[in-house]
Amino acid sequence: MKFFALFIYRPVATILLSVAITLCGILGFRMLPVAPLPQVDFPVIMVSASLPGASPETMASSVATPLERSLGRIAGVSEMTSSSSLGSTRIILQFDFDRDINGAARDVQAAINAAQSLLPSGMPSRPTYRKANPSDAPIMILTLTSDTYSQGKLYDFASTQLAPTISQIDGVGDVDVGGSSLPAVRVGLNPQALFNQGVSLDDVRTAISNANVRKPQGALEDGTHRWQIQTNDELKTAAEYQPLIIHYNNGGAVRLGDVATVTDSVQDVRNAGMTNAKPAILLMIRKLPEANIIQTVDSIRAKLPELQETIPAAIDLQIAQDRSPTIRASLEEVEQTLIISVALVILVVFLFLRSGRATIIPAVAVPVSLIGTFAAMYLCGFSLNNLSLMALTIATGFVVDDAIVVLENIARHLEAGMKPLQAALQGTREVGFTVLSMSLSLVAVFLPLLLMGGLPGRLLREFAVTLSVAIGISLLVSLTLTPMMCGWMLKASKPREQKRLRGFGRMLVALQQGYGKSLKWVLNHTRLVGVVLLGTIALNIWLYISIPKTFFPEQDTGVLMGGIQADQSISFQAMRGKLQDFMKIIRDDPAVDNVTGFTGGSRVNSGMMFITLKPRDERSETAQQIIDRLRVKLAKEPGANLFLMAVQDIRVGGRQSNASYQYTLLSDDLAALREWEPKIRKKLATLPELADVNSDQQDNGAEMNLVYDRDTMARLGIDVQAANSLLNNAFGQRQISTIYQPMNQYKVVMEVDPRYTQDISALEKMFVINNEGKAIPLSYFAKWQPANAPLSVNHQGLSAASTISFNLPTGKSLSDASAAIDRAMTQLGVPSTVRGSFAGTAQVFQETMNSQVILIIAAIATVYIVLGILYESYVHPLTILSTLPSAGVGALLALELFNAPFSLIALIGIMLLIGIVKKNAIMMVDFALEAQRHGNLTPQEAIFQACLLRFRPIMMTTLAALFGALPLVLSGGDGSELRQPLGITIVGGLVMSQLLTLYTTPVVYLFFDRLRLRFSRKPKQTVTE
């Protein structure tokens, strides 16, 4: 009593305390960063290595395996995957959440150094690493286009000037430049002209290399001067290479231009990038795992004017894609929802109290509690994101509950004629323990969430802490500011009602009277109520088992990502045509704003596309509906598939795949894996629960297999090295010399002119100069035949791996898909040598599924323990917890009604309901116990009186929580797919709980009281507390 009196009788101190809390909250709000979700990115490091010309199998065995053995020893590696393709290997290391990315990078560098001696000596450079996840969607894509400059020049500007500068910006993890390659001088040889002149490809290569040499020439000195010697030993342009003499034939000079077409071009012509049907260079920017996306994007945007000044005016630098606008729009929607929730909650209070003066009190308590929470969020290192703001939106109904309970009880004493200050003191004393019990038991619900590990625990921690802090501040405010304002603002008389509100008051009285009559009937038919309660428990179990489940709601971020997968034998020219065709189909869709894509590199039959949709207020369809519409049109394109998926704020794993979910096959027997993967993929493609089924196993690429006749070669004076050098010179885009410029180095690339390599007959035109100087056709000592070869070799850990990716059709959930895959694997009878497991987001979903029931049980057990400690009773907590089954039924039925799967967001709603609905029972039980102790009432009389007496605050608190959550259900716009499942769960649970617990709680209270008396050693004692 003295504690409450201190704040009631010292209003200035109480007001200043509340002002201090508010000011700290405002300061914290201004300093909080903005993000779509809490920081949940796994630390990921990508290691890259190259060996030009090496086959995927060679790269896997000689480069990937030694590196994997060394990298696999690093502490904290949770997953290691690799992909080896023509001439390149990429290894993705995913670390545990608590692993520092910088420390992990040092360990990665040490592991690379340790493996260096085991790597092939012909590698042009050491393996490198980058602190970025290549499977993440770029946070921003910049494009360079020009009507004046070539693609090579644009690529040079992008890679030499723009990318290094952008990489230095805080938060940027990787800048990937695509769409072309660096400028180069390309030498396209005419094999027939070479044969006529008796010049081999090696002769040409040697002549070019010897003609372009950059070495120091020294200096001349006399007694007083020094001269640096400089020569014209370098050739820099195609025009300078063309007249180069490479051979003399019968005394006549054979120049390079006589046997080749020499052009200023690019290093790799098998690269193409486009934006909205126009050739472009792409800069794909990804953030560091721990970086804030909004801050990083803002920093890049601030740097763009400076970057524009470093490139010529004829080059157009544009932002093709930016993830931040939809994130900001989503947060603005949540903030609007929060404001609406506060307004609705205050309206509920006003309708029940029917007094503007009384309504001001909770109207002040709510913002003080919510704003003060921002200070704690800042101190905890949190951000303003969808989940933390949703926590504050839900907290609106919670924080007003405490103020309502205190205010309503004080108002009851005032209406009975008690003086204001005395009523404030007496009313607060009566409900102080009730408010404390409600708040502590509600916070207790979140303790299991705070202890939860992995990605779900990291994701929900900010939500749980934010809500708990808001409840804690609300508890402080309700026991200090609220009674003080009641004591000094309210009058010791029944407040005058406005005429238009009297009807609501009469309706409330009639409702209370009707409830009293129905409660009497219920208390005389307790067995029927018991059956209903048991039925809700059984219905909970059945609904939970049958409801579709997923990991996280499918978001509409306004960005789509597409992966092109074409026939494995497709040429680059045909693949570029497919890219253009797909881009045209997508660009013609009315919901699409921008399309950017590229193809080429080490995997000729693949490409990537990034699609920006129009803002949500300019389109009526969701991202998934747009994908469904485009899927029908894209399926008509022959020879290639484009798999679309909506970019999500959460993506787990480092695998680059063409769909949202992955199922990985592992085997130590590569032959078994290659045998079973097509069978499994074809089976999964027939399942109605899956869509866009595809695989990263590509072992059916076209290959021309040459078999040397070594005896013939020895007789003709030709060795294998000379023959292989011929093929590399002719078809390998061989980099034979380096052109040094002040800002960069460029290559001279030699190959047979593509005009002469359009079919297999090009091999018949190749010849080798033997040791006697004679031209020997390749066909004299080699035979060739087409064969199949892998385009890529994939590992996970140290096992061969193949990942099958899939999306979900409209109306199907991840639980449906995972169950269907498990059944299919069983039906196929896959041998034990091939192991299947879900990967990425699907793997986290499986782990979360296994822990959800345990988490709910842990939350209930924690609440029971806290209530047992507060009430010093084993029985009363059970009475209070009996309210939960009805809430669970309501929540699950509401999800079914709205066709929403049970996700991590819905799980939060269930946890919140555990904390919300028990408040009704706490108010009933508290007053019933008080009536038994001091009113000498029987248990039935006590609980009946408690139910009627607390009917108004129960209705107020429940409706406040319901109206606080209702805007989440009704909200549209950006991010609504995250908010709606939470609102649906809470509203459904509250409605069902309110209908049932007003009757089941009294019955359970009486049941346990009779049970207590039956087993009590002192059966005549009414109350044991």
Curated annotation (Swiss-Prot):
Listed InterPro entries: AcrB_DN_DC_subdom (IPR027463), Acrflvin-R (IPR001036), Multidrug-R_MdtC (IPR023931)
Native species: Shigella boydii serotype 4 (strain Sb227)
Keyword Transmembrane: yes
Localization in the cell: Cell inner membrane
HAMAP family recorded: MdtC
Taxonomic lineage: Bacteria, Pseudomonadati, Pseudomonadota, Gammaproteobacteria, Enterobacterales
Gene3D superfamilies: Multidrug efflux transporter AcrB pore domain, Multidrug efflux transporter AcrB pore domain like, Multidrug efflux transporter AcrB TolC docking domain, DN and DC subdomains, Multidrug efflux transporter AcrB transmembrane domain
Oligomeric form and interacting partners: Part of a tripartite efflux system composed of MdtA, MdtB and MdtC. MdtC forms a heteromultimer with MdtB.
GO molecular function: xenobiotic transmembrane transporter activity
Keyword list, A-Z: Cell inner membrane, Cell membrane, Membrane, Transmembrane, Transmembrane helix, Transport
Protein name per its UniProtKB record: Multidrug resistance protein MdtC
SUPFAM superfamilies hit by this protein: Multidrug efflux transporter AcrB pore domain, PN1, PN2, PC1 and PC2 subdomains, Multidrug efflux transporter AcrB TolC docking domain, DN and DC subdomains, Multidrug efflux transporter AcrB transmembrane domain
